[in-house]
Amino acid sequence: MSNKVRIALDAMGGDFGASVVVPGAAISLTRHPDSEFLLFGDSALIKKELEAHPALKAVSQVIHTDVAVSMHDKPSQALRRGRKVSSMWLALEAVKNGKADVAVSAGNTGALMAMARFCLRMLPGIDRPAIAAIWPTVRGDSIVLDLGASIGGDEHHLKALAVMGAATASVLFDLERPTVGLLNIGVEEIKGGEEIRAAADLIRAMAQPPFDFIGFVEADGIGKGAADVIVTEGFSGNIALKAAEGTARQIGEYLRAAMSSTLMSKIGYLFARGAFRALREKMDPNKSNGGVFLGLNGVVVKSHGGTNADGFAYAVDVGYDMVRNDLLTKINQSLHRNGAEAHGVAPAA
């Protein structure tokens, strides 16, 4: 690996494009000065933003394209229109060709997933990717996957997610043996559908898993920090994510209304504002920004499309950590070490 971490950025992705991507990269660079950047997009817009960030400009290369994937494009449309020419595709292609170590985009999730699968292909034995993200809990942070990369999945898919999720938690949280749980409607072994019960059996039967399996976890256990890694298929994972985000916003609105409803409540807020500030920082979605696409033959990080520069910087940080800690190699080794088990294929005789 090069001494520098080379980061390819889709500078036209997301709701705000280069106006967020460039300052976000500049913030990340202050934390990781051994980074270099390839910025793909409208060169005039990118260079204008770079003028305010000379340190970033000095370690960046701008590659022009005026084709950007819309947040409203369907994946099939994005592939037809943006393949080979869009800022999103070119960032991914830089990873494929070895010019970058990781691609980061705040663009259309479905389009990014489709392009990543087409451009980078899947790891051997993995038939579909997953989105893994950091989830703040009362005990720290957890990794939750899949958060919507694909719908459904049999027991072998869930087992592969457990292996990849554990490798990700080991890298991000510096854990030797992370705990892993399967999201279910109850913790009892008889609960849930056939696939999830079969997945639990397959995981328990693994000879030398790189994690400690704790069984089933209910939805309220995610926020409680019941496990370092929570595994679920993409439909349930995406619903859980959106429900949690909505609940956080609802609580925030309730608190704001309560603290401004009367003179006494306003006075009380003055005494408690330090605690409320700490709570707001803990629940700040920007600090959990950066979903990792797992299962691909390359490292790809997805930022929230509507994030600000601070949030995008956290997504870049995630990509940096993935590369510096060699996540792709560790996932491959973990899948191989657990043999065809992790892929749901019978070992050779």
Curated annotation (Swiss-Prot):
Biological pathway: Lipid metabolism; phospholipid metabolism
Catalytic activity field: a fatty acyl-[ACP] + phosphate = an acyl phosphate + holo-[ACP]
Keyword Ribosomal protein on entry: no
Enzyme Commission number, as recorded: 2.3.1.274
UniProt cross-references to SUPFAM superfamilies, sorted A to Z: Isocitrate/Isopropylmalate dehydrogenase-like
InterPro entries: FA_synthesis, Phospholipid_synth_PlsX-like
Superkingdom field: Bacteria
Enzyme class: transferase
Molecular functions (GO terms): phosphate:acyl-[acyl carrier protein] acyltransferase activity
Main location: cytoplasm
Pfam family, one: FA_synthesis
Family matches, as Gene3D superfamilies: Isopropylmalate Dehydrogenase
Record-level GO BP terms: fatty acid biosynthetic process; phospholipid biosynthetic process
GO CC term, one of those recorded: cytoplasm
Residue ranges crossing the lipid bilayer per the database entry: none
Keywords: Cytoplasm, Lipid biosynthesis, Lipid metabolism, Phospholipid biosynthesis, Phospholipid metabolism, Transferase
Subcellular location per the Swiss-Prot or TrEMBL entry: Cytoplasm
Family: Belongs to the PlsX family.
Known partners and oligomeric status: Homodimer. Probably interacts with PlsY.
Cited function: Catalyzes the reversible formation of acyl-phosphate (acyl-PO(4)) from acyl-[acyl-carrier-protein] (acyl-ACP). This enzyme utilizes acyl-ACP as fatty acyl donor, but not acyl-CoA.
PANTHER family to which the protein is assigned, alphabetical: FATTY ACID/PHOSPHOLIPID SYNTHESIS PROTEIN PLSX, PHOSPHATE ACYLTRANSFERASE
Name the UniProt record assigns to this protein: Phosphate acyltransferase
Native species: Rhodopseudomonas palustris (strain BisA53)
Source taxonomy: Bacteria, Pseudomonadati, Pseudomonadota, Alphaproteobacteria, Hyphomicrobiales
